[in-house]
């Protein structure tokens, strides 16, 4: 076999030029492919622009579940009720979107209607470019959740009710029944080559079955199908009146008792008007009456380049002029209402170039905007309106032409706004005015925040110049303005209203042009309303550090009203070793809502001393250290005069003089002879001389140990000699425990002095001091716990407050309902016959008059306060834990003393206190109970609710509540899935854990994030951290 080299070659090698041309050819093919791809993407972008135009309008609904009440007046858009609520809702929506990720696209909002069902709000949102409905909805929900509007303090919105509907141009066109299938069904058709073509979603085949185009390109006035079938008059004829393309110099279209959408979808009737090139189109509305949700949009032009010029619903807009020979009219039908007659529009063509300057300018706005044009490059549009605008603190109450509510005028957008806006109105091009002419007009600039009105002239040859300008508040009246025009080239006049964020409407009426120079005005030149003083700083210019001799300070603006939402700090200082006395010379605050809090020391380690509110006078406050912090905190409502205070420093201010060595000092500072201490008879007015006369020590629990008695300030150990069971019971009861359980003699290892106990004939204990016990025998006493934490009413087990169930009567006999000024506000737990444990935040600012509080014990149904099981007690003392910090929500616990001791019954029993620092492990199931809200921001319960919740570790709780600092003084409980939780109104109530058939108070309901959300547990004050503090009040 010969080699391959011996076979003659049938191909020759390519030359260098041939290789070069081949490479170039490949590159050109690649470039063509890239250009095709880019063109395709560009076409798709154009299609999208065609669908949505230069601006985008979305319609939304939401439900107000509290903060406003529905009434029939809300159906009347001219009523004060409608205007007030619409203003506040628009303010809320504007606040949210102007602080959102869509703030650059967002323009404004408009409330259309209120419906019953709590209150359902229907509104429109306008954006200057297309945004997805999903994105709009997400931003709105996030803004409400983040409380991005001050209106959300008042309104509570049902987040699940929020819905944003698709934009106008996404709806299908309604056609007559004979042709509707062509627009609503995409069917594969056979091409001449027997090739079946199926269009992608949102596209349809042209009639030639060779090309697919976007559905939105059908019936838009521009030919997109090669055969023109997308604009076929039969295909596009509307179901409203059977018309589509209108081409005469005059004609009409209508939607009389217009058809309703089917299958719960919205629909559109669309008309295209074309007149001769160079002409414009005037639309006269013979009648117009549509439901608020059914909107007629008027566009200048057609197809992808059309510009939205007007959105119309409900009321007759008068005459609309479009300065183009093409108009697209699109009627969006969303409702199924049948009580509206619809509309009829007659159009005529006219030549705007035949108008003179006077015809182009003169306008009283009674029939529309005349020949004035909205400046679409600005932030918003002028509104044609009549009657008063809302709120009444800005804008006119009537027009200038007629001087009553029947006449029309134009105004910058009424209602709230979240940013400054420029709103422009332009003339058509005007002819030069060498003979001079006088432009006159009437303007209305009223409101504290009104900004500026400017009139400018512009031309192609010269830069824009300002010929008239006013700034500020000129009061509640129409003012006359005039300026002479003297232009040598074609020019335009523009009116610009500059709108501030709120309460800043500017109105115009009766614009006219007359021959000749302006004469001296017979109307007086308006004067500015004095500007109100600047807003006061909410921090009072602080924080302030004060030392002697600079010892007097006041709330800001005293004796005039202080600012709302203030948070002010004064740090008072004294030399080391001294303390501080704070005195309020004058004191007048809004009761409860505005407070002055005084703390001992500075910073996080400072201790709570007092909180004052309402009218004075108030008591002096003394520090125990050389520093004192004064906090002034106000809400966003009513403001009063405030306060004037001073302080002095010294040694031992407010501290009683110490007693002599042979005296005992009572808690109130009184001195009594030492021999009277622990003698069985109270000599101190506060009973403190008999409060701590017996104790247990060296025991394994707080209910066992050796017994000690205090005799004249010296502790004596009890001997076992003569000890009896009765003495055990007596000593255990003196300790605040139950009966004696056992007493065992034990050998003494020294450490006297000692005391022998005997029982007197009257049953009292006789104490005899001794230097030694008989046979060195001491008594080791074990007491029973006092009866507590026991349910005495037999009940069935109920199934597993929010997510809870009605409890049975007597199920939780220690749960107490707290009323302030006869309003049920919080819960509490009974821990003895005369003391309750509750939350500090419940009584904060409400502690100055304890008698305004009452406790209802044995309550089951809040609506039945006459039940025989109930006992009601007034409160005569409130003690807030000195470590409580309201801002950090730490140590949120307080004691409340009943004016009269309560009797224990089957329905009234105390709950047990846990051991000091007792541990309740994570995962343990405990119980909560209360009459609080059944859902977040909902109504409170009538029947006492109960539920079980698992405890969480503080580490996990911190992860789930990252915005709070979860301290060792807190315990958390709740399910990861949510659904069960304490809520508003449950504050101060118990978190209860069962142990050894007794219920222990493990926590006090403190705070949470809303109620029962997933991974959002409730947070409670951890009671074992406060057991010793609580017990100090009980014994």
From Swiss-Prot:
Domain LDL-receptor class A, which positions? 197-238, 657-695
CUB domain residues are 240-350, 540-650
Q: Which reaction does it catalyse?
A: Activation of trypsinogen by selective cleavage of 6-Lys-|-Ile-7 bond
A GO term from the CC aspect = membrane
Q: Does the keyword Nucleotide-binding apply?
A: no
Q: Which GO terms describe its biological process?
A: protein digestion; trypsinogen activation
Q: Which residues lie on this side of the membrane: Cytoplasmic?
A: 2-18
Q: Where in the cell is it found?
A: Membrane
Start and end of every Peptidase S1 domain?
801-1035
* Stretches assigned to the MAM domain: 358-520
Q: Indicate yes or no for the key word Cell membrane.
A: no
- Write down the top EC class of this protein: hydrolase
Q: What is its EC number?
A: 3.4.21.9
Q: Which parts of the chain span the membrane according to its record?
A: 19-47
Disulfide bond entries: 199-212, 206-225, 219-236, 240-269, 540-568, 659-671, 666-684, 678-693, 773-783, 788-912, 826-842, 926-993, 957-972, 983-1011
Which GO molecular function terms does the record list? serine-type endopeptidase activity
* Major location category of this protein: membrane
- PTM remark: The chains are derived from a single precursor that is cleaved by a trypsin-like protease.
Protein origin, superkingdom = Eukaryota
Q: In which tissues is it expressed?
A: Intestinal brush border.
Family the UniProt entry places it in? Belongs to the peptidase S1 family.
Protein task: Responsible for initiating activation of pancreatic proteolytic proenzymes (trypsin, chymotrypsin and carboxypeptidase A). It catalyzes the conversion of trypsinogen to trypsin which in turn activates other proenzymes including chymotrypsinogen, procarboxypeptidases, and proelastases.
Please report the name of this protein according to its UniProt entry.
Answer: Enteropeptidase
Q: What is the lineage of its organism?
A: Eukaryota, Metazoa, Chordata, Craniata, Vertebrata
